[in-house]
Amino acid sequence: MARILIVEDEEAIRSALAENLRLEGYEVEEAGDGIEASRKLETEPIDFLILDLMLPEKSGTDVLKELREKGSKIPVLVLTARDREVDKVLLLELGADDYVTKPFSFAEVLARIKALLRRTIFSEGDSSPRTVNIGSAEVDFGAFTLKKNDKVYNLSPLEAGMLKLMLEKRGKAVTREEFLRKVWGYSILPDTRTVDFHILKLRRLLEDDPANPQVIITVHGVGYRMA
């Protein structure tokens, strides 16, 4: 099982997450501040990071920025306070893979961890093509990469799964609830805004002008569709 580092200065939240994840079979490391987090990321093999941005000693923002600057691609789930406006663009630029708002349920966190750690988006016997052209980009679902203008970008399993679902239903709207059920694997749906967060990232990769999308189209009141 994956080794998860939980970085959270509120001991009650950190301990509860750690205990529940251990019961699920994960190896868990804990850190209560940003300096300890950076040290553990440097010295221990970590497969997944749960990171609160508001930390003592060194902010979670700095921890994440340094992690990505060093080339690490481990999945990062950010914890944010519900009463704070989530700056999705900032999270994208920092390299976050997903976020949850406090208070959250353990089931929601666990579903996101499993979705981000998924190694493949293809089921046994799936004959879908592994490489597909979308607009002016080439997506390799086997390698989780997107190539555009001679630049190659990494996709998370969630983002690759979202693209695959929209391609399967090309021209038809995919609801936020459908994304969460089929890509995230939720049975009980949380706040659907996390879908919009990932659509924002995909548009920044696929669209020539993300503010005027021509590839991933918003269907108001419903969800999104692939043009």
Model-identified regions with their sequence ranges:
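Hydrophobic residues on short alpha-helical segments
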Residues: P75, L163-K164, L180, L200
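Short coil-to-helix segment of the ABC ATPase nucleotide-binding domain corresponding to the Q-loop/switch region
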Residues: A107, K172-V183
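Flexible coil/turn residues that form the inter-helical turn or adjacent wing/linker of helix-turn-helix
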Residues: S72, K172, I188
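DNA-binding patch around the recognition helix
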Residues: P129-R130, N154, I199, R203-A227
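Short, Lys/Arg-enriched segments at the junction into DNA-binding effector domains
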Residues: R3, A115-A173, E177
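Short helix-to-turn junction characteristic of helix-turn-helix DNA-binding domains
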Residues: L41, M166-R170, V183
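Short alpha-helical elements of helix-turn-helix
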Residues: T61, V89, A111, P157-A160, ...
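N-terminal/domain-start alpha-helical segments
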Residues: M1-E124
